[in-house]
């Protein structure tokens, strides 16, 4: 009888131990809502399977600066062929921005303005790629603070021009340089 009581006591202790050590699922894996303040800007996109930089089980996405960095600035480097700035996909804006800066010594250009931005201690801002810029357009009502202007992307067009997007119509222009100046809104990846 004494052995039975001891056995039941061990089962009880073991069960309580398992219960207290069980891992509680937390809400930390919830996808944050588009439009919230996040890492110095406003969250506008959470990476999905197939996106460059997507890692299953991890939260990664894109944040936009809360206001324009410039309202009248050139894409820059007129007459200079920019190599490596022709990527359009989500996840390629930073690479395009670096390629533009490496090929162009002008200081007052869209890519440079974005790369030099520091907001709330975050200094990894860049000019969005064509597809990243389109995501901004699609979410502009949630993000707010966007005007119906032409915005630059970091995606080059034909080596000499840059892609831009009209935030009134949503139309994307490959020969955006003919318009001269565009607005700039920096983004960052997390």
Task: Describe these PLM feature segments.
Residues 64, 127-128:
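GIY-YIG nuclease signature motif recognition
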Residues 6-15:
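Sec-dependent N-terminal signal peptides
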Residues 30-31, 48-49, 107-109, 116, ...:
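C-terminal, surface-exposed recognition/capping segments
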Residues 16, 21-121, 178-190:
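Short, compositionally biased
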Residues 73-77, 127, 146:
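Non-catalytic, surface-exposed connector residues within folded enzymatic/regulatory domains
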Residues 1-3:
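N-terminal secretory signal peptides that target proteins for export/translocation
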Residues 7, 24, 93, 138-139, ...:
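Alpha-helix initiation/capping motif
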């Amino acid at each position: 009888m004494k052995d039975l009581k001891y056995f039941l006591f061990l089962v009880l202790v073991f069960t309580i131990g398992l219960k207290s050590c069980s891992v509680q699922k937390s809400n930390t894996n919830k996808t944050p809502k588009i439009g919230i303040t996040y890492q110095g800007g406003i969250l506008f996109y959470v990476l999905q399977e197939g996106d460059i930089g997507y890692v299953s089980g991890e939260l990664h996405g894109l944040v936009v600066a809360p206001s324009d960095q410039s309202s009248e600035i050139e894409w820059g480097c007129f007459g200079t062929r920019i190599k490596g700035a022709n990527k359009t996909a989500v996840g390629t804006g930073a690479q395009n921005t670096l390629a533009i800066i490496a090929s162009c010594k002008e200081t007052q250009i869209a890519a440079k303005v974005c790369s030099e931005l520091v907001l709330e201690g975050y200094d990894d801002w860049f000019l969005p790629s064509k597809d990243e810029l389109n995501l901004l357009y699609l979410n502009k009502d949630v993000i707010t603070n966007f005007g119906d202007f032409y915005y630059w992307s970091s995606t080059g067009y034909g080596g000499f021009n840059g892609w831009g997007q009209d935030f009134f119509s949503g139309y994307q222009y490959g020969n955006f340089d003919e318009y001269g100046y565009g607005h700039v809104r920096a983004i960052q990846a997390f």
